[in-house]
């Protein structure tokens, strides 16, 4: 049996359970062979190891039941980097890359990528946001806060994996409570799903992502309220905050931001949905230098 035959069999086993069955199968087989998916076509005609078909079938069956590939493999690519996952962390999603790209664009325009900016990542999870930023900003320093000790451990592991551990620190905390410093950038992907909507999420999210990282309270805004209430204290003069929000939440978040003294613009995701709230103090201009 060839590698290509194993891959096709895995895709058939996943079937209609995933709209990306062929891609899922390719990722699974590549992982089992210890190569990247892009290299798999070069190995299609190889004779598959005896164990490959059985292992691929086992993982494909799990995928067919709704388990995400990233959960099975324990890692996920985000912004060109591979991040280790744990049960305490969300699987990083393309929507959140919109936040990273928005932050990088503002930094480049305002201070330049070599500036010694400081970054606070609230609800850091796997550390995907702050680690991705630090790999692009050679003189930046970052701190990540999360309510889960397991997530903090995973974030530190990812910082080490990508060579930025000497510029990143992580701690268990409740949003901004206990944060003493002020930061040029505050970034956050907080829980913003309404509690009553959790049960209606896709099975791969509902049953495999930590509810602590999903549940935003009755109206989905609990964490956003908490962040905005203390943002002025932790954001340096001239600083900018980037907060991921849910579909349909832009008007509410914009009103809350204004009530707390911030002007708010939005960056859309690839689907055209306002996904990232970009917040600056109403009284400030855009010419302040980095705090760090």
Please name every model-derived segment:
Residues 218-280:
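Conserved Class I SAM-dependent methyltransferase catalytic core
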Residues 98-200, 248:
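Conserved SAM/SAH cofactor-binding pocket of Class I
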């Amino acid at each position: 049996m060839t590698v290509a035959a194993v891959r096709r069999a895995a895709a058939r086993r996943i079937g209609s359970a995933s709209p990306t069955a062929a891609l899922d199968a390719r990722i699974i087989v590549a992982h089992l062979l210890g190569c990247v998916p892009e290299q798999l076509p070069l190995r299609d005609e190889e004779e598959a190891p005896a164990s490959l078909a059985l292992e691929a079938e086992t993982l494909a069956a799990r995928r067919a039941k709704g388990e995400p590939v990233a959960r099975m493999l324990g890692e996920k690519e985000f912004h060109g980097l591979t991040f280790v996952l744990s049960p305490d962390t969300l699987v990083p999603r393309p929507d959140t890359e919109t936040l990273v790209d928005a932050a990088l664009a503002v930094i480049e325009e305002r201070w330049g990528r070599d500036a010694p900016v400081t970054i606070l990542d609230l609800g850091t999870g796997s550390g995907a946001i702050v680690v991705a930023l630090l790999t692009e900003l050679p003189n930046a320093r970052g701190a990540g806060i999360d309510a889960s000790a397991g997530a903090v451990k995973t974030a530190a592991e990812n910082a080490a994996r990508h060579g930025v551990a000497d510029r990143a620190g992580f701690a268990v905390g409740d949003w901004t409570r206990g944060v003493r410093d002020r930061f040029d950038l505050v970034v956050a992907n907080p829980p913003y799903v309404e509690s009553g909507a959790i049960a209606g999420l896709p099975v791969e999210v509902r049953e495999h992502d930590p509810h602590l990282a999903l549940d935003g309270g009755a109206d989905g805004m609990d964490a956003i309220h908490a962040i905005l209430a203390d943002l002025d204290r932790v954001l340096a003069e001239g600083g900018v905050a980037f907060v991921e929000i849910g579909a349909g939440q832009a008007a509410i978040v914009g009103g809350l931001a204004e009530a707390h003294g911030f002007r708010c613009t939005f960056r859309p995701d690839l689907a055209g949905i306002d996904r990232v709230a970009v917040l600056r103090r109403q009284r400030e201009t855009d010419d302040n230098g980095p705090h760090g």
